[in-house]
Amino acid sequence: MAKRKHQGKPAPSDRNFGELTHKFKNNIYGTNKGKIREAVLQRDLHAQLDWLGHATDKRVLDVGGGQGQLALYLAALGHHVTVIDISDEMLELARIRANEAGLCERMRFIRAPLQEIAQLSLGQFDLVMCHAVLEWLVDQRSAIDLLKAQVSPSGALSLMYFNHEAHLMANMVYGNFDYVQKGLKVKQKVGLSPNNPIKQADMAAWLEAAKLTIAQKTGVRCFHDYLRELNKADDDFDALLELELKYNRQEPYASIGQYTHLMLIPIN
């Protein structure tokens, strides 16, 4: 098995990816990892939201929306989408893509951190999305309360976060024993490696306190990151994606995806 470099966990701090915008575009969004993520999120949203693509009056908020891949997809379905991100560079790329697609009239772009959502007075939304953001924040628990406050009583929260248990398991599979023994911590920050993976037990406690119930749990990249032959993801991607989508909502696979995607409903 090829030994892979572990993904480090630096000292806690919120993260702005402005300086890594093009690296994100090439190393995440344009890769098999990005394709799996996009396919999983689209499938899950359609499975849980019967109005998707039909009720064009529905409002969507994408927090930490980055370059706007999913936001553009939802705007193309006819929905009004507000994208919030802390990075000017990310938002500019999203604006360019929205303009090229003729979607600017249905999209709004705001530069702000998640922590300032309440101050923006945007009202509540039928769908709030926050994908791959929490693991970069210091105060993850408070972020969940802020997100829930933006969800309408009949709305939903789509939350995706970096899975601590899967991160540990993957590094054991890769043979990074020292890294695991050190508690998945390194001294130096790694560019695209999340700062704070989230434990499933912690997330469960936070959701209970926030009065959010899980309507659907999905693992994202349940198999991709554990492949012994790294070239298989490229050589037979369609088969890999089909199997990811087939099993990633079933346990135990749903709990070993590198990311966990939750569709959450507020308890009113």
Where are the language model's segments positioned?
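Short alpha-helix
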Residues: 194-211, 217
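A C-terminal cap/extension of S-adenosyl-L-methionine-dependent methyltransferases
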Residues: 216-268
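A short glycine-rich, Lys/Arg-flanked "PGG" loop and its adjoining helix->strand segment in the class I
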Residues: 141-156
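A conserved beta-strand element that flanks and buttresses the S-adenosyl-L-methionine
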Residues: 129
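Conserved class I S-adenosyl-L-methionine
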Residues: 2-55, 57-64, 69, 73, 101, 156-183
